[in-house]
Structure formats: structure tokens, C-alpha cells
Swiss-Prot record:
It comes from Arabidopsis thaliana. GO terms for biological process: defense response to oomycetes; glutathione transport; response to cadmium ion. Coiled coil: none annotated. It is found in: Plastid, Chloroplast membrane. Involved in thiol transport from the plastid to the cytosol. Transports probably both glutathione (GSH) and its precursor, gamma-glutamylcysteine (gamma-EC). Keywords: Chloroplast, Membrane, Plastid, Transit peptide, Transmembrane, Transmembrane helix, Transport. Its main location: plastid. Disruption phenotype: No visible phenotype. Clt1, clt3 and clt3 triple mutants are more sensitive to Cd(2+), have a decreased level of cytosolic GSH, an altered systemic acquired resistance response and are more sensitive to Phytophthora infection. Clt1, clt3 and clt3 triple mutants have decreased lateral root densities. It is a multi-pass membrane protein. This is Protein CLT2, chloroplastic. GO terms for cellular component: chloroplast; chloroplast membrane; plastid. Residues 1-79 form a transit peptide.
């Protein structure tokens, strides 16, 4: 749920979600199977015994009653294999969704760049339009699906305070990210943003109780390194953090942590709802609607701070938004330089909506980490496309050899993450 900050990576959605070749089918089968089994009552309670006994983070989200069956203390190891699931694999669906998401993510980044051609003076207006406009769209869809019986009363009864946490973390991530991006040189921002995947691994361990193989951890790190090398291949790639200090890089890393935490909590909501709904899956528009609604609420409370970060005095914000609306609809004789509106902005918004819905669906059927890896594949593809002459962007640019090297490292990381493994006898017994 996130698209306000386009300083480093194009918007995933305005403030909603700010993230990831298609995965090989054996790998996807492995990921999808593990996520379903890991959320059983037994695995959740077992992991809670061996990790963070004093302040169990997962117990703050779990509200289902504990089982009374005897519990065994598991042996925790980062290199241990996750339990295999007996649920049939939906890897074909994950592959199809991954392909769609890569295509939509590339289109999303390119169209955002094109949308800023007429809206180059009003990027903050675009951010607020998507933030608050998406709330109206999502709740309209949710209301329609509720009337059609697709969304049930049980789905609407899921705890709403979890969505409040999601919205708060995403809004806080946007605010801190904007503050840090204003103080940091451009080339270092995508590098620091790759800590997002590292935070996801950590929060999946703490909140979901998930265990990762060493090849999965190494694969995620390789993907992050590949993105850094590919994105930082431009003329300003030699810019370093020297002379910047520790504060603002730390703030940007914290911003990635907030958004990564929100993505993992979304995954937790889907898995916990499957137990509450007796095997039925939670409709994604319940999560999108309430998550976006709470995010918009917190963004509204932070508007004075956010507008000042963009150099817009809060007292001048109404007139700025009015001029932005005029440029968006390309009306008014006083507004110039808005050629391409409203077609280009509307193309971006419609693509961004489809992208956000598809991305959340991938989180639902696989995991937040799989969605992030899919997203990261789109980064070099989008950079390559935007280096070519485009309508309204005829210039184009050349890419260095580092770009190719970064893409190779990224693909190797994806392959390493998805290496199929054979469960040992011990792991089979614990399933």
C-alpha cells in the first residue's frame, strides 16, 4: 500500500504498501506449502516456547485459544528446513500471479514516470489523490462484494486493530522515508531501501515463526545486492554516505522496517483468518479497504508534517491541491505545462490499482517475501525500459556494464532462493 515516495522506487501505491524472472515451479511449491503448515496451532505454540519467551510478539496478534495437547520444544535453527505441507500446491497460480505482477510492476514504474511529465509540479497532489482516492474505491468494491455475498459476516468480524497497526506502520514508513529522502543523495536511497527484504526476513522469523534455509537467506541477500548494482549503475553511482552522518541513513532504514513490518502483518492476517474462517480464505478487499482506510487516517494527521517536507507550507496546501486538481484535469487557462493530463495520470492510477490488488493476492496465496522478490525483478526491467526513448520522454540514456552484472546477480539470487530441497526423515516426522 504505498506510492507517495518515488524518490527511490516507483510507487507501489500511494502510501499503501511501500516493496518484488518468475520463480521456478519447484521453488514456488516449496514456499506455498511451508507457509500453510507453519500457521497450524501446534507450530505456532511450539515456536512461541523457544523464541522470545518474555515478550512473544506473535502472542500479541494471536487471539485464538491455545490447544491443550502436549507441546514439544522444537530445535530452532536458521538452517533448519521448514515443515512440508500436505495441502496440494497452488504453484501454478503463484507462477501466473508472479508473471502478472512483474508486468504490472514494470508498467507501474514506467507510467508513474510518464504521469509526472504533466504533473511534475504536483507530485504531492498525486500522492494524496491515490492515498485518499483508493480508500473510496476499495470500500466501494468491498460494499459491492458484501452485497453479492462474496464477503461474509465472519470476514467482516476479523479484528480491526490489526489493520490500524498496518495503516500506522505504512503511514509512519512514508513519513520517515520522505524525511530521509529529502536529506540523502539520490543514488544511496535505493541501496538503503534494500534493507526492506532483510527486515522482512527478520519479522517473518519473529511474528510468523518461520524458519529459513541458508540458501533462502543467501538468495534474498543476492537479490538485494543485484538490485543495488543494477540501479546504481548510473553516472552518480559513486556517491557515498561520507559526510552525511548516521542519522538520516538510519531514518531511511527505519522507514523500510516500518513498511516491511506492515507487509508481514498482512500475511499474518491472512493466515490467522484461515483458522478463524475454518479454512475459508479472507477476501483481499477486506484487508485492502481497512488497511488503506487506517493509513489514510494517519496520513491525514501527518499532513502538516508531510507538506512541509515537500516545501509546501500547510497554510498554502489548499491552494496547492486546487492547482494540482486543475493540472490533473488539464483545465484552466492559468495552468500550463500539463500536456498529457488527464490521460497519463489516469493510466498510472488504473495500472497502480491493478498492481496493488494483484500484489496483495500474491501475499495471500504465497508470502510477503515471495511478493518482494517478484517486485525486485521488476526494478532492472523498468530501468532498462526507461533508458529507451518513450513518449513525452524522448531522451533516453545509456546503461553501464554494471547494470547487466546486477541483473545477473539478481537472477542468481532468485534461483538460489528457489533451489528445491528434499525434506529429511526428521522433518517428515515433525510435519
Amino acid at each position: 500500500m504505498d506510492t507517495v515516495l518515488m524518490a527511490t522506487t516507483p510507487p507501489i501505491r500511494c502510501l499503501h504498501a511501500s516493496i518484488p524472472t518468475v520463480f521456478r515451479s519447484p521453488a514456488i511449491y516449496q514456499v506455498s506449502c511451508r507457509s500453510s503448515q507453519l500457521f497450524s496451532y501446534r507450530s505456532t505454540t511450539m515456536m512461541s516456547m523457544c523464541f522470545l519467551r518474555r515478550s512473544d510478539l506473535r502472542s500479541r496478534f494471536l487471539s485464538t485459544p491455545k490447544t491443550t495437547s502436549p507441546m514439544r520444544r522444537p530445535r530452532f535453527s536458521v538452517g533448519a528446513s521448514t515443515e512440508e505441507s500436505s495441502i496440494p500446491s497452488n504453484r501454478n497460480l503463484i507462477v501466473a500471479n508472479s508473471v502478472v505482477i512483474v508486468a504490472l510492476a514494470v508498467a507501474n514504474r514506467v507510467l508513474y514516470k510518464l504521469a509526472l511529465v504533466p504533473m511534475k509540479q504536483y507530485p504531492f497532489f498525486m500522492a494524496q489523490l491515490t492515498t485518499f482516492g483508493y480508500v473510496l474505491i476499495y470500500f466501494t468494491i468491498l460494499y459491492t462484494r458484501r452485497r453479492l455475498g462474496i464477503v461474509t459476516n465472519e470476514m467482516m468480524d476479523v479484528p480491526k486493530w490489526r489493520f490500524a497497526i498496518i495503516g500506522f506502520l505504512e503511514a509512519l514508513g512514508v513519513a520517515t522515508g520522505m524525511a530521509a529522502a529529502a536529506m540523502l543523495p539520490g543514488p544511496v536511497i535505493p541501496i538503503l531501501n534494500q534493507t526492506y527484504l532483510v527486515w522482512q526476513l527478520l519479522f517473518a522469523l519473529l511474528i510468523l515463526g518461520r524458519r529459513f534455509l541458508l540458501n533462502q537467506i543467501a538468495g534474498c541477500l543476492l537479490v538485494a545486492v543485484g538490485v543495488v548494482v543494477a540501479v546504481s549503475s548510473g553516472s552518480g553511482a559513486d556517491t557515498t554516505l561520507s559526510g552525511i552522518g548516521f542519522l538520516w541513513p538510519a531514518v531511511l532504514v527505519a522507514s523500510a522496517a516500518f513498511q516491511a513490518g506492515a507487509s508481514i502483518i498482512k500475511e499474518f492476517v491472512f493466515n490467522d483468518a484461515a483458522k478463524r474462517l475454518e479454512g475459508k480464505s479472507l477476501d483481499i478487499f477486506v484487508v485492502n479497504s481497512f488497511g488503506s482506510g487506517f493509513q489514510a487516517l494517519f496520513v491525514f494527521l501527518l499532513l502538516p508534517f508531510l507538506s512541509n517536507l515537500k516545501g509546501i507550507p500547510f497554510a498554502s496546501l489548499p491552494s496547492y491541491l486546487k492547482d494540482g486538481a486543475g493540472c490533473f484535469f488539464n483545465t484552466g487557462a492559468k495552468i500550463s505545462g500539463c500536456d498529457g493530463a488527464p490521460i497519463l495520470p489516469l493510466l498510472y492510477i488504473s495500472t497502480n490499482l491493478a498492481f496493488n490488488i494483484s500484489l496483495l493476492h500474491l501475499v495471500k496465496i504465497s508470502s510477503a517475501i515471495v511478493s518482494s522478490l517478484t517486485m525486485m525483478l521488476s526494478v532492472p526491467l523498468a530501468v532498462y525500459i526507461m533508458s529507451k526513448p518513450l513518449p513525452y520522454l524522448p531522451g533516453g540514456s545509456s546503461l553501464s556494464s554494471n547494470f547487466t552484472m546486477g541483473c545477473i546477480v539478481l537472477v542468481l539470487g532468485l534461483l538460489l532462493y528457489n533451489i528445491p530441497t528434499t525434506p529429511t526423515k526428521q522433518h517428515t516426522k515433525t510435519s
